[in-house]
Structure formats: C-alpha cells, structure tokens
C-alpha cells in the first residue's frame, strides 16, 4: 500500500465513531457540551429541544424552543422514573446551572436518567435579560435609576412577559414529561426551584413520584422579603462561632462587630477601589459603599467554604 493511502487508512481508524442519538419518547438526544458561565469549563451531556407555545391559551401562536439536557444513567436498563433538576434564581438556566451541580447527582445516575430543561425566559433564544451599562454594575445605582432601567428593559422585549411566570413555566415541565413518555418524576428543586417544584406538584400531582426541596421558598412568601432578616441571623451564627472560639477570637477579635464597623465606614465614607476583573484580569474600579458590603457578606455566607473566610477577610479589610 502506498504511504499516502496507508496514512489515510490509519487516520480513518483513529477517528472516533459518531455517537448514536438517544431517543427517549418523542425526544432525540445528541451529545452536547454545556458551558458554565463565567468560566472556561464545559461538561459533556446530551441535549434535545422541546417546542412549546408561548401562551398555553394560543397553541397556534408564537413558539418557544426550550433546551433540554440529559445526564444519562450508567445502567444499561435505567429505571423508568427519571430525576428532574429544577434550577433556582429566579432566572437561572438549568442547562447552565446543572454542570456545576452534577456531582451531587452522581449516585442517582447509577440507575436513573437526570433531565433538566431551561425555564422559559432563561435560555438561548428566549432569554429575558438586558445588557445594563457596565458603569451601572460598578457603581451602585439609585432607586430611581434602577426603576428607570427596569422599565427600559421591559420595553425592549417583544415577548408577552405575562407568559413567563412560575404558574405557566410548570406547564413546560409537564409537556417535557409527556414528551419523554415518562411516568411520575422524582423532582428536585433548589432555592427558587423549590417554588417551581411545589407549583408543578400542585398543578400536576400525578406527575410527581417524589419531591426533594433544597432551601425551601414557600409559595406564600414574597421573594426577597426575608433576605435581610435571614442574612442577619446567618451572619450572627457564622461570625459568632469565631467570637466563641478562643483561638479565632484572639486572631480576629469579634468579626460581627468588625462587619458593622466596616458597614458604618462605607456608609459615611464610600470608597472607589481598584480590583482585577476575574475574567479579563484588567483593572476595574468598583465603588465600595454600604450596599456593596452587604452584598459581599451575603454572597460569602452562601457556602461553608466562603463563610469560613469571613473572619479573616473582615479583619484584613478593617
């Protein structure tokens, strides 16, 4: 065989075979790489699309194409009752959120498929989001400015925003279940996703085999109404542990009092501080005021890893 022909033959053997599409019910899944926003990381899953009417009352009207993700079971004969992952926010895309949460579903995937679908308004092609000027993200906007920005954002949409509520979004979940030909689902919801899960169970009780709610948002609670109260309780507990531990107190004093001292200083003397952008590494100037201190404390209190850093960071900031 001539060298060129031999090389071509070897190259053909080295090309991995094209994965066969997986068909579940009416949906055909193919391999896809899902990106994690803000990082360069991608994860390999399987994806399909589901077309639904924007308005359930107008089935022949405008259509939305929702992205569906599948973390396939490892078993060659998976159980019929799948796990449904519902993202939080509100506003998170499930196909952007699941990759970072996938590790927590590893054991479930031994025998069951895990499916997830972008809630209407959160995914590519139907995302209800506005590009605010970067200066407004760096400097705290006044209440009046935020209201004006919200009105301008709303006016820019060509969508019927009344059709992007929780009570309408769960109809897409039921459409997904029926398209998959699945029996009742094992539904997982986190944060705002717990409200979606509860609403789905309310409207479609026969579609739910089990319900797992992580960080429950009761249906009757106005979103955001208890954030400050819960944050205060969390910070007292987190920072109080340091104050009660002799070695931590010796190193960092009373972090809770330090936090409020920083808050008071930022309130009376807000400062502009240079920080490296984590994505571009370019230096940006951010306004450090009372609101910024509260936001930083809240976000660091979200997970044990970052919460453990609060006494050190507060001490250094002070």
Please name every model-derived segment.
Residues 1-7:
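Sec-dependent signal peptide recognition
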């Amino acid at each position: 065989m001539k060298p060129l022909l031999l090389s071509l033959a070897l190259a053909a053997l080295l090309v991995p075979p094209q994965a066969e599409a997986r068909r579940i019910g009416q949906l055909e899944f193919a391999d896809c790489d899902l990106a994690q926003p803000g990082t360069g990381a991608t994860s390999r899953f399987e994806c399909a699309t589901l077309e639904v009417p924007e308005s359930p009352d107008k089935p022949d009207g405008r259509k939305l194409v929702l992205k569906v993700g599948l973390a396939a079971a490892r078993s060659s004969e998976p159980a019929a009752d799948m796990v449904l992952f519902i993202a939080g926010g509100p506003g998170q895309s499930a196909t952007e959120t699941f990759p970072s949460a996938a590790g927590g579903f590893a054991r479930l995937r031994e025998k069951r498929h895990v499916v997830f679908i972008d809630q209407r308004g959160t995914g590519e092609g139907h995302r209800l989001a506005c590009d605010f000027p970067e200066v407004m993200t760096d400097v705290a906007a006044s209440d009046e400015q935020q209201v004006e920005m919200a009105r301008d954002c709303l006016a820019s949409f060509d969508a019927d925003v009344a059709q992007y509520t929780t009570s309408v979004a769960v109809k897409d979940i039921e459409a997904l279940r029926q398209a998959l030909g699945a029996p009742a689902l094992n539904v997982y919801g986190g944060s705002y996703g717990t409200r979606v899960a509860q609403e789905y169970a309310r409207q479609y009780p026969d579609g739910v085999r089990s319900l797992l709610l992580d960080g429950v948002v009761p249906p009757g609670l106005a979103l955001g109404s208890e954030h400050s109260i819960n944050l205060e309780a969390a910070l007292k507990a987190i920072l109080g542990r340091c104050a009660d531990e002799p070695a931590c107190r010796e190193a960092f004093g009373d972090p809770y009092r330090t936090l409020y001292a920083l808050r008071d200083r930022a309130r009376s003397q807000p400062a502009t501080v240079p920080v490296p952008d984590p994505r571009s590494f370019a230096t940006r100037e951010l306004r450090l005021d009372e609101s910024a201190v509260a936001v930083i404390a809240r976000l660091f209190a979200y997970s044990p890893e970052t919460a453990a850093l609060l006494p050190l960071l507060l001490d250094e900031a002070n």
